[in-house]
Amino acid sequence: YIGIVLTKTLVIIQNIFPMINIYFIFLVGTYSISFSAFIFLLRKRKCKIFLIVIILIIEFTLLKYFTYSVVAYLLATSGVLLLYKEEKNILSSIIIFVGFSLRVQVIVSVILLLFGIVLYEIIVNKKKKKTVYLAIVTALVIATNFIFVKTNSEVENYITWNNKSTLIRDY
């Protein structure tokens, strides 16, 4: 399921514009934002044209797997890389928040996937403060979802049911 803050925001926008598929526009927009962030990060690199071509090939290849989970991974990853490589703490925090909120279940795997980068940035580049930002954003997503689920019995029952039905369907 999608994180509660993002869900509520999208529902409000969808209610304002009922004839427009806000969810699809949001998904395409965030997909584009994530790859724009990757390309932005390459602007100072040598061989940037070659790297941009590779990024674009990956972008078009991933269109075949255009899902909330893939976009969540892309957004969160691009946000983390922006956080450590640029002085754009607010923008990168928003991108990470939206990425983790888009598919809450990807948080652990994104952290594991980027663990080496985070560790490197802490040890070599001494970017402990940025790691605290990352931890705060992650905790914020987890906390808002946890609080909402625990205070809304209908949602809690649905999530319990959905988790059990997913176990049956996945095996």
Regions found by a protein language model. Give the residues of each.
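Membrane-interface helix-boundary motifs at transmembrane edges
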Residues: L42-K48, K85-K88, E121-V132
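Juxtamembrane membrane-water interface segments immediately following transmembrane helices
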Residues: T131-Y171
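Aromatic- and kink-enriched transmembrane "portal" helix at the membrane-lumen/periplasm boundary
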Residues: I52-A76, S101
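Membrane-interface transmembrane helices that cradle and orient dolichyl/undecaprenyl
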Residues: S78-L91
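Transmembrane-helix motifs of polytopic, lipid-linked glycan transferases
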Residues: V28-K46
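Membrane-interface alpha helices of multi-pass inner-membrane proteins
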Residues: I57-E59, I90-V106, F115, T138-T144
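Short hydrophobic/aromatic helix or loop-helix immediately within or flanking a transmembrane segment
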Residues: Y1-T30
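Perimembrane helix-loop-helix junctions
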Residues: S109-A139
